[in-house]
């Protein structure tokens, strides 16, 4: 495929469960990582997680699942676990923030990661999803005050939430805002996805690079933004129907070099 950064779903993303590891799997993974020079490697947690809702059973299960993910990531030497905080389902961010922080503290306490980070992904903003605005992510980071927690910045979700990325000036403004509110020092990885729907649509629909509303000019601008140069870019696009592929990686490389 020609990629040099990796994200995987170690368990089916639409079902509850955490990775199950044994010594053989751990050893095999670490040998392969060493063979290929330890590329940036991330887990994406299951999509069912909701730490922001009012159902205590759902929150408890979400906490347990995320804890298992973070433990496994740390055992393997994976860079981090990317996750969606969930939806407050109309209760409001301020109402649910204390509960979110409580559960995330417990995840960190129980997993006790030495190197793997817990990475909050920004959301598209549909249905009370938490983290669509940079200010909400900043509140969670500040409330935790833990260097083991960082951010995954998703280009499609940001665009759907109203952060424009279509021109060099748009990208500069959005990254200025991200740095001012969240702090680029907290951003660990970028999900690089075009958007099927328009600016501020609050809809999470990924498109192949250059075929959506952000467009090639937007991604060229993102790839040439010097403040993002050291970060891995992870594709989460449909490709030819089976997800990210060599063609989409080649598109990014072409835009980065043009």
Describe the role of every protein-language-model region:
Residues 4-8, 41-45, 81-83, 118-120, ...:
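Hydrophobic faces of well-ordered beta-strands that scaffold small-molecule active sites
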């Amino acid at each position: 495929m020609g990629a040099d950064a990796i994200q995987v779903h170690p368990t089916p993303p639409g079902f509850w469960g955490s990775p199950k590891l044994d010594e053989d799997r751990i050893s095999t993974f670490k040998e392969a990582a060493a063979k290929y020079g330890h590329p940036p490697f991330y887990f994406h947690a299951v999509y069912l997680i909701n730490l922001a809702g009012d159902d205590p059973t759902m929150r408890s299960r979400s906490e347990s699942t995320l804890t298992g993910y973070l433990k496994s990531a740390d055992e393997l030497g994976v860079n981090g676990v990317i996750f969606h905080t969930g939806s407050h389902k109309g209760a409001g961010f301020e109402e649910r923030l204390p509960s979110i922080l409580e559960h995330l503290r417990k995840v960190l306490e129980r997993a006790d990661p030495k190197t793997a980070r817990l990475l909050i992904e920004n959301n598209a903003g549909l249905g009370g999803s938490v983290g669509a605005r940079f200010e909400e992510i900043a509140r969670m980071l500040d409330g935790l005050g833990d260097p083991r927690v960082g951010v995954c910045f998703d280009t499609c979700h940001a665009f759907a939430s109203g952060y424009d990325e279509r021109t060099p000036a748009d990208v500069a403004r959005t990254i200025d805002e991200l740095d001012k509110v969240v702090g680029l020092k907290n951003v660990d990885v970028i999900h690089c996805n075009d958007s099927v729907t328009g600016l501020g649509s609050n809809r999470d629909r990924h498109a192949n690079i250059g075929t959506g509303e952000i467009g090639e000019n937007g991604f060229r601008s993102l790839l040439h933004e010097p403040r993002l140069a050291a970060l891995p870019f992870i594709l989460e696009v449909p490709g030819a129907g089976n997800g990210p592929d060599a063609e989409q990686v080649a598109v990014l490389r072409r835009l980065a070099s043009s």
